[in-house]
């Protein structure tokens, strides 16, 4: 994953390996992380990828729930601790969380405290005085998402995600889950067949823009997580994945001239 805003000097690079299990809920465990860099302050932040559950399957009322406790660590010396505690079988509200911001030298001295429901609203307080500094409403007009500017589907490369998953997206938007699953399976089956054909020819499939690096070379992660229980798990993710800027600079359509996502 790569996100960047050259105008504001913000960049994020991350990757994940997802493990799924089922025990009445769909459990998604994410192995990986994201590094956020802010040019203005020359700061790096290590962001965790939280575990997510899809609950309500038995009641046919699906909703997501983030679970567990996490830390965001920065090169500035400041950190945050976030604990998600959603609805249980007996009591509790959906999507609840509590968080605090502190300096790593004084983890018990909270500079800010945040609590609320991440899908609705939360309150930010001064950690020393308890004064409410801000109330954030997710659905407030001023907090709406920025408008996305996308090329028309017909102008996109067959490997761009919205075109590759066009049929699946359309069926999901129409509420046709069975048709969406069939469309999803068609793309996945085509990709598995391509991998088998490449293996038979002695070829190795390579990502278009990302390259894998040894975990020992990921110095930012090693520096920021030193002294914590955070592990890289680079063996399970087949290395640390980063965008290759040179490949991005030379990218031209068609991205893979000899293949589409379906053949």
Please tell me what each predicted stretch does:
Residues 1-263:
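Extended acidic, Ser/Thr- and Pro-enriched interaction/regulatory segments
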